[in-house]
Amino acid sequence: VKEDLLTFEGKPLFPERRAYTVAYELSPAERELYDLVTEYVRTEMGRAECISQAGDRKRGNNVGFALTVLQRRLASSPEAILRSLERRQRRLEDRLRELTRIQETASPAEKEQTDARFDAKLPSLSIHDYEDMDLETTDSERLQFETQVEYVVDRATAAQTIPELRAEIAILEDLIRVAYKVR
């Protein structure tokens, strides 16, 4: 988008972006973490796609977005993925406690509305929104967007039942253990 902007003279307004890939070797521990997080993302992406195809596109898109951001953080640094996994685990544990409390105390009608109520709080984000952040974005806009990104990344899940949520939390615990070894 911004690459297409021209000056009044018809010249590109911004210089051409050039990205270079730098090859480097992963240690065995880094490779294990990369493979495990990639498998987690791949599996959950499949579940997100099923959710979208079943008619809940917003939820499916949010889960897909959250997982894509996690995968990018994996490429960023071991510390970045560790912190992201820890935050995600904490938020999903909070959600599990809340769902368990509702299941124990709510009427049947309230129990049916539980999932919709949690998902309704998440803003809709896409990877295009994430990629479109540029240098012209103000610090305030960037902070607001990053806050929304963290909110979705930490909370969006394909789990649809309490046992599925427990299983995802257990996977995150395993990933965190491996990430600590890499750190």
Tell me what each language-model feature is.
Residues V1-L122:
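Inter-lobe coupling linker of SF2 helicases/translocases
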